[in-house]
């Protein structure tokens, strides 16, 4: 069999896309494969680092390369266990190489479309966690510090990282600002995070900015 780097199939875009395909198949009609891939494309396009590291076009190429490796070799047997299991589940009764090529073609076709707005295609839970990881993580901090005022909790979270707080502080405010733009209105992200209303997100931004102006003039 043609050699291939196992790490390419231990993680990365092929494994992610197979996971989304399985999720759609096992949702009993609640999820559409096309829509899950549209969300994947929207997520990659919306993150400069992700897009620079592995564009959607490249991800479709990885699927094609995988299909070639399966077809020219010993099937899925030489692949890492997690990849093999997901490929078998996703393909079902279809030849795995054929399924991977079909998935690659779907990705390529949908990549030609503009990304749908969130009002048109709501943000999925997995997409939310990738788009707002710091706000999602802040939820746990609020649970631990539930007796404090909201601004005090924000202040403590930033101060505890000082003087190495720049990365976290920037991430909190960036994600909060992005949430306010993407989800205008008083509820903002409340449907995903009970506390993340417009007022609370604005308070978070103001509190972090206050710390930065005071400690990092």
Each language-model region and where it sits:
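Charge-rich, solvent-exposed alpha-helical interaction surfaces
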Residues: 20, 36-43, 61-69, 79-86, ...
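An almost-null, non-specific background feature
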Residues: 18, 24-27, 72, 92, ...
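Function-determining sites in protein domains
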Residues: 1-4, 82, 159-202
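Amphipathic alpha-helical binding modules
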Residues: 74-130, 188-217
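Amphipathic alpha-helical interaction modules
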Residues: 27-76, 137-177
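Short terminal alpha-helical segments
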Residues: 1-45, 100-156
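Amphipathic alpha-helical interface segments
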Residues: 11-31, 46-50, 67-79, 87-98
